[in-house]
Swiss-Prot record:
<keyword id="KW-0458">Lysosome</keyword>
<feature type="active site" description="Nucleophile">
    <location>
        <position position="212"/>
    </location>
</feature>
<feature type="glycosylation site" description="N-linked (GlcNAc...) asparagine">
    <location>
        <position position="15"/>
    </location>
</feature>
<keyword id="KW-1015">Disulfide bond</keyword>
<dbReference type="InterPro" id="IPR029055">
    <property type="entry name" value="Ntn_hydrolases_N"/>
</dbReference>
<comment type="subunit">
    <text>Heterotetramer of two alpha and two beta chains arranged as a dimer of alpha/beta heterodimers.</text>
</comment>
<feature type="signal peptide">
    <location>
        <begin position="1"/>
        <end position="17"/>
    </location>
</feature>
<feature type="binding site">
    <location>
        <begin position="240"/>
        <end position="243"/>
    </location>
    <ligand>
        <name>substrate</name>
    </ligand>
</feature>
<dbReference type="GO" id="GO:0005737">
    <property type="term" value="C:cytoplasm"/>
</dbReference>
<dbReference type="GO" id="GO:0008233">
    <property type="term" value="F:peptidase activity"/>
</dbReference>
<protein>
    <recommendedName>
        <fullName>Putative N(4)-(beta-N-acetylglucosaminyl)-L-asparaginase</fullName>
        <ecNumber>3.5.1.26</ecNumber>
    </recommendedName>
</protein>
<keyword id="KW-0325">Glycoprotein</keyword>
<comment type="function">
    <text>Cleaves the GlcNAc-Asn bond which joins oligosaccharides to the peptide of asparagine-linked glycoproteins.</text>
</comment>
<dbReference type="Pfam" id="PF01112">
    <property type="entry name" value="Asparaginase_2"/>
</dbReference>
<dbReference type="InterPro" id="IPR000246">
    <property type="entry name" value="Peptidase_T2"/>
</dbReference>
<comment type="similarity">
    <text>Belongs to the Ntn-hydrolase family.</text>
</comment>
<keyword id="KW-0068">Autocatalytic cleavage</keyword>
Amino acid sequence: MRRFYIFLLLIPYINGTINDDSLPMVITTWGSDGFKKATKNAVDATLLGGRMFGLVEGLSTCEALQCDTTVGYGGSPDENGETCLDSLVIDADGMRVGAVANLHRIRDAARVAWGVMNFTKHTLLVGESATQFAKTLGFKEEDLSTEETKSWISKWKTEKCQPNFWKNVSPDPSSSCGPYKTNPLTKSMRYYSLVNQSDEAGYLVEKTNHDTIGMVVRDTENIFSAGTSSNGARFKIPGRVGDSPIPGAGAYANKFGGAAATGDGDVMMRFLPSFFAVTQMELGTKPSKAAYKAITRILKVFPKFSGAVVAMNVKGRIGASCANINKFGYNVAFQNGTVVTYSISCLKEVNSLKYLKEGIEFA
């Protein structure tokens, strides 16, 4: 049976463009209460201090609230039980970018990323060196673990370290904990692929296991900012960095619009979905179709991939698309503080490409 998926564009328009009285405007991934609060704080802060202040305040809200335990401290520990943070902030005016990845023992990842933008000529700082940079700026060093994360690790180890992110090692990572040793490469592995690539995309994305807030801000001057904050994949190999802090992967913005992504970051970062969605909007594609194209080009290679993209263009139109998630919610906020949460059905592995060739447009 054929299934069709609708991409909603429910937003106040006047003669095809958004009413300027609605600006600033913010769109964020995920529809839970913490994300709604972050969305409202972002639009309020944008009115007070501009698009970058609004972006950072919104992301920082989710960090403090530990949104769905997938943002901020006390979530998604690595194999060693340590929680590390990633964040990205982008200002479309001048393409200014700051990011941190694998940030240890500092809670304020988004503010540190903003510090990279404002106080260095770099784009991305990583690991312990990023922590030292944060301390130079006056950020407090503290343990990001909680009793809950410690219990997760304990349970994970008693369940033979399942799931994990190892492959082609011994003992069998699908049934045993490490330490692991690499298996000898066969001839076919050397010349073709270490594993069937479809096995690389099986990271289940859901409400408590999605790892990211992605946000796009459009200010009163119609200029965009965009960013992310994340504590990464749960039980990841220490040192792992996903899509969230990578410009064009986790988020992207220019004068034509902005986009943000969430989901299986190890796969998504290979396709730069946020950059792709924005460039599609630059070519005149509506946000819903731009997000849809960004998702389906990943599904063509990784049918089991799960994730989502939200997008907003310079006319104030919004759109979203998702794959292999039961339901994906996202928020839109306006100048008056109203936050509207939408929920869309997602493309599925078994039928996403066979029948549906393009998103259904509204408005």
